[in-house]
């Protein structure tokens, strides 16, 4: 399941001041990395770059967890384009780099870092879920927020 057409992304220039300038580094963390390596690496990136969404996070806080998650989803959907990474290349961008690259597009790993960072700044417990569709390997990752009764947002 992939995006079939580009959507119009809002400018977001009113939020630019909330993000530090990104470091334009693209280090290779591990050659031949697996999905499991990526899943383990994302929380590390979130911890190391948590300050990058600390000014944005309070602006997205709603009156409850559900409203907050909705605000985060709408912000990301309207301000950051999706674009799958090149085959064989997995980029894990910091939130500042993801914001900078928002018109070009970022993939689900980078969306996950961005959203997980906001949730972490708001002290909202969440997990990362990986899934696959019609292929034998995992293709998608996204954050989920547990709710009472065993459900997830």
Give each language-model segment a name.
Residues 17, 78-79, 100, 104, ...:
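Histidine (H) residue identity feature
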Residues 110-153:
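Hydrophobic/aromatic-rich core segments of domains that either
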Residues 68, 72, 104-119:
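Active-site nucleophilic cysteine motif
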Residues 14, 24, 105-107:
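Intrinsically disordered, low-complexity peptide-like regions
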Residues 11-12, 64, 88, 149:
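Intrinsic-disorder/low-complexity loop/linker signature
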């Amino acid at each position: 399941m992939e995006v079939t057409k580009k959507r119009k992304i809002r400018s977001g220039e009113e939020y630019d001041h909330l993000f530090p300038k990104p470091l334009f580094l693209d280090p290779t963390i591990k050659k031949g990395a697996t999905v499991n390596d990526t899943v383990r690496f994302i929380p590390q990136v979130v911890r190391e770059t948590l300050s990058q969404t600390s000014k944005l996070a309070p602006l997205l806080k709603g009156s409850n967890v559900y409203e907050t998650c909705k605000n985060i989803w709408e912000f990301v959907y309207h301000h950051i384009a999706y674009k799958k990474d090149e085959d064989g290349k997995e980029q894990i961008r910091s939130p500042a780099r993801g914001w900078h690259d928002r018109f070009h597009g970022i993939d689900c790993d980078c969306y996950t870092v961005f959203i997980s960072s906001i949730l972490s700044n708001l002290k909202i417990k969440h997990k990362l879920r990986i899934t696959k569709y019609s292929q034998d390997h995992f293709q998608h990752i996204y954050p989920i927020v547990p709710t009472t009764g065993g459900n997830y947002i």
